[in-house]
Structure formats: structure tokens, C-alpha cells
């Protein structure tokens, strides 16, 4: 059965807002936050069949801005690739750049590609962002959504229309009431599922719930890919992010030595 998603503006003017309305309008915590750490890195591993995949992730928060970097260590065909995401939640800005070793320069992704995945993986660009992509609708839509596939039945689904560059696209995010975190996400076009992502195992309070394990799926391909965090996040000097991708990767490799080798 689908769940009815209520708009954040659905409370009747002049009445005391309901508990459900208060939940709907409550701010959502940043994705992949690590508690008190504001500049940090962690390692991830996964596998598609017998092909291992290993990544390093760096994240820095400064006020209302965030920088997120993902570096591919394996598979070998993608080794040396990276994704660089810069966000400013106050200005509602988000830029995503990708680089693979065969490129002379990094490429800034146009908006319609931001709802897809890194090449040869199930890692979605949306899943790496600190906040909901600003090009989505400002408030949830009053529509039926199907989140029956998710292991978070009590989480509150919020469905947002995609930008004009992606007609018919919607993104539904399910928010856990206890933590305020997005724990499941579905991307659909014309009501047909394209991608799904969800938290499988939440991290402890000492790391702000940074997931221990998530899974993702390109629905048309069938099956799920499990991504596991290897060890705890480590502090990273903020200036390492200003030095550019190559220097940041070196810093992450030193700090996470042995966790994603």
C-alpha cells in the first residue's frame, strides 16, 4: 500500500499545528554527518559479484556550506576517479564535478545527470550530498508513494518534484523521527522506480549515527549493492580541502591507512 505524503503547508491557518505537521517541518540533519566532527574522512568497501570496490570519502562543514569528496581506489578500471561536491544551503547552491584518469580536466555535471550514479557503480550523487538537492521542489507533494521496499516503515516519506530539466522525476526521502536523518531515498520517473537507497545499519551516537552500512539499487538492473564503512571516521585538517583533490586524497590515505588498502 502507498503512503499519503502530506505537504508541509497543509496545516489549516489559524489552528494549532498538529504533531504530524511539526514533524514534517522539522529540519532534517545533514546526510553522512559524523557528530562533533566537522572535517573528517572515512573508508567504504563494497562488491559487485566478485569485483571489490573501495572508496575514500572526505567531508567538511563550514557554517552553511559543505564540501564532499569521494575517491575511487577500486575497481582498477575506475581507480583515480573522484567526485567533488560543493554545497551552500543558505544560497541553495550545489555543484558536482567528476574526474576520471582519462580526462584532462574535471567535468561539471549538468543537472539532469545529478539523479543518476557514478559510472559502473550504484553510488548516487544524491546519496553523497550533505543536504537535499536545492533544485528539487521546496515543499513535499501531496501524493501517494510506495516505500514498502524499505526497512524503515515508521519513517516519514517526503516526496519532492524534480527540476524542470527532469520532467516527470520525483525524489522521495524517508526521515527517521528519532534521529531526524534521511534513512531511505527513492528516485522515480513517471511513477517508475529508477534508484533506491537506504540505511541498513546506523552508526553509534559517538559518530552522529554515520551509517555503518547502506545499500543501493538501480532497479532496472535488479539486486542490491551493500556498502560498508570500514572503521571509524577520522579528523581531517580543514585546509586539506582547500588544497584540491590530489592533496586531499593523500591526506585521507594517510589518516585512513590500512582501512581501505
Predicted regions and their residues:
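Short, low-complexity, Pro/Ser/Thr/Gly-rich segments in the mature regions of secreted, periplasmic
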Residues: 246-260
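Short, low-complexity, intrinsically disordered N-terminal peptides in bacterial proteins
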Residues: 1-16, 261
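Eukaryote-specific, intrinsically disordered low-complexity regulatory segments in nuclear proteins
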Residues: 135-137
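N-terminal mature ectodomain segment of secretory-pathway/periplasmic proteins
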Residues: 9, 15-102
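Catalytic cores of nucleic-acid ligases and guanylyltransferases
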Residues: 2-7, 101-103, 107
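Positively charged, low-complexity intrinsically disordered regions
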Residues: 4, 55, 60-61, 214-219
